[in-house]
Amino acid sequence: MNTRALVRLCLVSTIIIALDQATKALVATTLVLHESIPVIHGFFNLTHIMNPGGAFGLFAGHSPEVRKFFFLFVSSLVALMILWLYQRTAQTHRVLSFGLAAIFAGAVGNLIDRFRFGMVVDFLDFYLGAYHWPAFNVADSAITIGMVVFVYHVIFNKVPDL
């Protein structure tokens, strides 16, 4: 990996991780657990939630030890796989490298929470009427955006041979 690609990874990751951790800290110090502040009435709240599971509450019903092991292991594995893929594509596929850096940063952002709290701070709460999309955070958003970029490259055969 050349220096420019490494700088791109570090810069994008640092910005996303810092924004993720800063927003989570702000929510945790401003709102008590489960408190909501309406931002757009009938559509969007800031709600302090501690998510013991994964996306959509995956594994939330398992013991804290099982969850912690599973998510720490999987998050670490994903981060390493993304770094491996980034190293192989960053010089030739610039847009893909931004997407991979976003996935990496999101995984690390949530991994920090799992190390610190054994669960993840979520707070972005979108809803329509009684239907609530599961709350999420900046790290989750980065992972989602990065995955959209990655899937685009896969679908349109823009991922290089590895």
From Swiss-Prot:
The keyword Hydrolase applies. The active site is at D122, D140. GO terms for cellular component: plasma membrane. Pathway: Protein modification; lipoprotein biosynthesis (signal peptide cleavage). The keyword Cell membrane applies. Belongs to the peptidase A8 family. This protein specifically catalyzes the removal of signal peptides from prolipoproteins. PANTHER family: LIPOPROTEIN SIGNAL PEPTIDASE. GO terms for molecular function: aspartic-type endopeptidase activity. Keywords: Aspartyl protease, Cell inner membrane, Cell membrane, Hydrolase, Membrane, Protease, Transmembrane, Transmembrane helix. The lineage of its organism: Bacteria, Pseudomonadati, Thermodesulfobacteriota, Desulfobacteria, Desulfobacterales. It is found in: Cell inner membrane. Its main location: membrane. This is Lipoprotein signal peptidase. InterPro entries: Peptidase_A8. It catalyses: Release of signal peptides from bacterial membrane prolipoproteins. Hydrolyzes -Xaa-Yaa-Zaa-|-(S,diacylglyceryl)Cys-, in which Xaa is hydrophobic (preferably Leu), and Yaa (Ala or Ser) and Zaa (Gly or Ala) have small, neutral side chains. Disulfide bonds: none annotated. The chain crosses the membrane at residues 9-29, 39-59, 66-86, 95-115, 136-156. It is a multi-pass membrane protein. It comes from the Bacteria. GO terms for biological process: proteolysis. Its EC number is 3.4.23.36.
